[in-house]
Amino acid sequence: MAATHKFRNFPCDYLAVDIETTGVEKGLDLIVQIGHCAVVNGLPVDRSGTLLDWTAVPSIDQRWLADRLALVKKRVEFDRQGQPTGKHYHVTYDRLRAEGADPIAVLRAYRDWFVKIRADGLFLVSHNGNQFDAPFLNGAFSVFLGEDHPVLDGELFDTGMVEKALRGNLGLWAEDTPKSFFDRVGRQPLKGVRWALDAFAIPQHGLHVKHALDMSLAHTADYDAYLCHLLFQHYLDESGRRLPGPAAGGAAV
């Protein structure tokens, strides 16, 4: 990519990030799980996901929260004809209440981490992160913490937009920066072009077989972050870019 040099420590050290939400409406929907896969020299060294327990927050309409989560689960697990998709959605109202952490504390921890990542010269990897995860996270930081942390150009590598560009034959322009490229690809409707992480990109590249992946765990934030890492490493391998040390892959961490 033109302006690849803007990614600091590229492509060795980064944090793959994913979120699960109650829907796609920024300013309305809530982040209910944040997951990450931290990578050093191309190898995953830490993977974790945290549920955000909005059930204990008085300002949140609990009936709305339960209904939104039930709707997301239905949309993931059943198609428009009501037939099972074979997919699973793992975030429920009861799980938030039983296993979730204080959402403000979780958001604060991740915002502080992102600030440190910027200072340390790492970058983020996410699937559709340019249009969805990054702005959704920044919106939550702004609303619930009163502090912005917008992702800067060259701080996020969007595997979703790379996959979409590959399938839609969208090339780079000489003046492209990472963000301008991801923005431009994101605006293209490209009817019929598939690039979803679990439903297309991972199986299309045979990564579910190569890494013996349990795809029933997709739509869990930490697992999807790990899938983003594997897809990013696949792009590096395909481009002939090699990392120092042993190749990434193998069993999930």
Predicted regions and their residues:
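Conserved non-catalytic scaffold segment of RNase H-like nuclease domains
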Residues: A2-N138, R194, A199-A201
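A short, structured active-site edge motif that brings together acidic residues
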Residues: T50-W54, P150-R167
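Short aromatic/hydrophobic-glycine micro-motifs
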Residues: V91, G146, I202-G206
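Acidic, Mg2+-coordinating catalytic module of metal-dependent nucleases/exonucleases
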Residues: A119-F136, A140, E175-V253
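Substrate-recognition/cap helix-loop segment adjacent to the acidic, metal-dependent catalytic center
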Residues: F132-E155
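Short alpha-helix plus adjacent loop in nuclease-associated cores
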Residues: F157-R184
